[in-house]
């Protein structure tokens, strides 16, 4: 099944997250594997509106290997074209010698370097349940200053 949780981007930094209005000038976006899908839709919505100046720091996109990265060409093209407000950082479990990004697991130090600080920011996360859990990304985001209410989560699930 696809992601659970209702998060709607209404434009120019405005969201409805689980029924509550939210606003952010900057977005910290985290995705694991196919969790890129709803995050990609938000990026696409922001970039198609020339008046939307929301900054997106899609700092962490985690996969097992480089070949598992979905939509990489599109993400890299957007990062190049919109370098003033869209950044992407990849993390893979295993990489070749020429890999220019991070290897291993997404952790607090990677988030501190590649995500915006929590002031005027909202973090969007989507990935398998273990990385969205209390043992995954949430504690690291809280440690760098994000409040739990500022981290709407699209929860990917494999349940039928």
From Swiss-Prot:
What Gene Ontology terms for biological process does this UniProt record contain?
nitrate assimilation; nitric oxide biosynthetic process
Question: Which UniProt key words apply to this protein?
Answer: FAD, Flavoprotein, Heme, Iron, Metal-binding, Molybdenum, NAD, Nitrate assimilation, Oxidoreductase
Q: Which reaction does it catalyse?
A: nitrite + NAD(+) + H2O = nitrate + NADH + H(+)
What residues bind FAD, as annotated?
37
Enzyme Commission identifier(s)? 1.7.1.1
UniProt KW Heme keyword: yes
Question: Could you cite one Gene Ontology molecular function of this protein?
Answer: nitrate reductase (NADH) activity
Cofactor descriptive note: Binds 1 FAD. Binds 1 heme group. The heme group is called cytochrome b-557.
* Residue pairs linked by disulfide bridges in the UniProt entry: none
Entry-linked SUPFAM superfamilies = Ferredoxin reductase-like, C-terminal NADP-linked domain
- Uppermost EC category: oxidoreductase
Q: List, separated by semicolons, the cofactors it needs.
A: FAD; heme; Mo-molybdopterin
Describe the protein's quaternary organization and the partners it interacts with: Homodimer.
This molecule's function is given as: Nitrate reductase is a key enzyme involved in the first step of nitrate assimilation in plants, fungi and bacteria.
Family label: Belongs to the nitrate reductase family.
Q: What is this protein called?
A: Nitrate reductase [NADH]
Q: Whose protein is this, by species?
A: Lotus tetragonolobus
What gene, per UniProt, encodes this protein? NIA
